[in-house]
């Protein structure tokens, strides 16, 4: 756990530096310099590329995490494991490329009526997909080598800095829209190159394929698992459907969703680091048949994620009003408050229970993943098609939340019945009760105290003073409650509680 903690902390620092840069960019640059349609365009381009890249992986990322323990051998550079991880994604990219050209005209027709900007730049999707694909593959290779901090910095910080530069260049009229979109997409090319160079500096990878080590039995096992897990990438990417379907109704809706989604996605940030560094450890425990360790790690990750996600959701929610009052053109995006709530709940559920997906994928029962992912994907698509016309931008967030519920209930049931693995504990119930109590107290604040602040005026100063007092008071209450609850030794240490 020492390595996990060390890399998680470094990764978390990169994540939150990226959040700071992203927050400044999103709330004070993008909303000021770009129209809602232009914001929606960048969102749809990235989401579509990430979805295509996920499918093009052909399950490679899951295979890296599952099979690396079998290949691990420092003396032979892991039997050329890195070289193997480059082949399947390239095959997948070729397949996606062929399908893209076959259905290109259909995609253009789908968006031409309400989102013609997408049609103008659809040609950039393939190169953007390629770089998004290998950026992720290189990042996963770094993860199994327990060197996740630098790739996290690249994903969370470097890309955001490069995007910020492109926003400023376009916003101040230094480049045209065409050049801006190319620069925006090029940030992923730079990130891919940096990740590759970093892997090479580790001195632990080799392009030489060890054909003698990979016998027919192992090759068959890897290929079957990899192809089976192709659909599994959709589990972590169902939110990508939201902007893609919203764009059908117009890029303006996708732009509103982008701003709200950025706020809600803060909730998932801790898991990006903790999940990436704990997954290889859990994979090793599953390979060793040490289910007691799997249970311990799974509950530990799940409990900590529930705590952090719940607190983040609460403090984001109570500060939404002041946030939209501060950002440029905030009145144009305030309709996204419902998205923040429902997508925030979806992110809380996913970050708390997502480790269950990894446990199943690493086990001998991974074949069930195809069933669950198919259920999740079908639910997400159908719910988006049904709810967006009825509830607009909030319907897309509700579709994600409901789809996750449909997905995790049978998944957790299977884990318990087949592996006797459970992610739940009494401490998690305490966290839920604390969160509900805080939301209830916030409701009382809105009813009794907010009118008193309104009597003092409606200016920005009054809004900020109330927000600071509310956040400070509830922060003190939350910390005091957590000190009494003793959620875990790690939480107690952070809160400076002596055992």
Predicted features along the sequence, with ranges:
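Transmembrane helical elements of multi-pass membrane transporters/channels
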Residues: 7-23, 159, 183-199, 216-284, ...
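Helix-terminus/linker motif at the lipid-water interface of multi-pass membrane proteins
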Residues: 23-38, 108-111, 234-266, 281-285, ...
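Helix-loop junctions and terminal segments of transmembrane helices
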Residues: 27, 57-73, 144, 260-303, ...
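Interfacial/gating helices of multi-pass transporter permease domains
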Residues: 29-51, 117-119, 177, 181-182, ...
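Hydrophobic alpha-helical transmembrane segments
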Residues: 153-203, 261, 374-379, 393-414, ...
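Membrane-proximal transmembrane or re-entrant/amphipathic helices at the cytosolic face
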Residues: 443-499
């Amino acid at each position: 756990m020492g390595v996990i903690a060390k890399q998680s902390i470094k990764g978390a620092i990169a994540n939150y530096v990226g959040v700071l840069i992203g927050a400044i960019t999103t709330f004070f640059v993008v909303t000021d310099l770009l129209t809602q349609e232009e914001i929606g365009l960048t969102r749809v381009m990235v989401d579509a590329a990430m979805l295509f890249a996920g499918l093009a992986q052909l399950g490679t990322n899951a295979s890296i995490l599952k099979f690396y323990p079998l290949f691990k051998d420092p003396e032979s550079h892991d039997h050329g494991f890195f070289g193997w991880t480059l082949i399947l994604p390239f095959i997948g990219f070729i397949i996606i490329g062929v399908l893209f050209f076959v259905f290109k005209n259909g995609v253009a027709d789908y968006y031409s009526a309400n989102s013609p900007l997408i049609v103008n730049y659809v040609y950039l999707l393939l190169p953007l997909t390629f770089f998004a694909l290998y950026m992720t593959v290189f990042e996963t290779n770094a993860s199994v080598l327990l060197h996740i901090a630098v790739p996290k910095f690249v994903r969370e910080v470097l890309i955001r800095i490069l995007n910020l530069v492109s926003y400023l260049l376009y916003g101040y009229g230094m480049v045209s829209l065409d050049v801006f979109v190319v620069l925006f997409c090029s940030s992923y090319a730079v990130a891919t190159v940096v990740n590759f160079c970093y892997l090479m500096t580790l001195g632990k990878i080799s392009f030489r394929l060890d054909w003698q080590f990979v016998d027919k039995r192992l090759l068959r096992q890897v290929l079957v698992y990899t192809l089976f897990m192709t659909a599994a990438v959709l589990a972590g990417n169902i939110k990508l459907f939201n902007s893609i379907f919203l764009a059908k109704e117009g890029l303006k809706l996708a732009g509103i969703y982008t701003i709200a989604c950025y706020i809600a996605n803060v909730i998932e940030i801790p898991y990006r680091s903790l999940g990436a560094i704990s997954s290889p450890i859990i994979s090793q425990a599953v390979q060793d048949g040490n289910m007691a360790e799997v249970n311990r790690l799974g509950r530990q990750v799940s409990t900590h994620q529930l705590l952090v996600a719940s607190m983040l959701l609460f403090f984001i929610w109570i500060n939404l009003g002041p946030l939209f009052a501060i950002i440029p053109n905030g009145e144009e995006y305030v309709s996204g408050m419902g998205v923040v709530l429902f997508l925030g709940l979806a992110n809380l559920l996913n970050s708390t229970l997502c480790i269950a997906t990894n446990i199943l994928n690493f086990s001998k029962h991974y074949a069930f993943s195809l069933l669950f992912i198919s259920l999740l994907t079908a639910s997400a698509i159908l719910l988006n098609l049904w709810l967006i016309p009825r509830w607009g931008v909030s319907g897309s967030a509700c579709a994600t939340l409901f789809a996750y519920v449909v997905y995790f209930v049978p998944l957790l049931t299977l884990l318990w019945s087949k592996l006797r693995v459970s992610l739940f504990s009494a401490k998690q119930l305490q966290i839920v009760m604390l969160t509900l109590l805080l939301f209830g107290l916030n409701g009382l604040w809105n009813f009794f105290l907010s009118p008193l602040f309104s009597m003092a005026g409606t200016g920005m100063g009054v809004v900020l003073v109330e927000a600071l007092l509310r956040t400070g008071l509830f922060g003190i209450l939350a910390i005091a409650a957590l000190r009494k609850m003793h959620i875990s030794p790690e939480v107690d240490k952070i809160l400076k509680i002596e055992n």
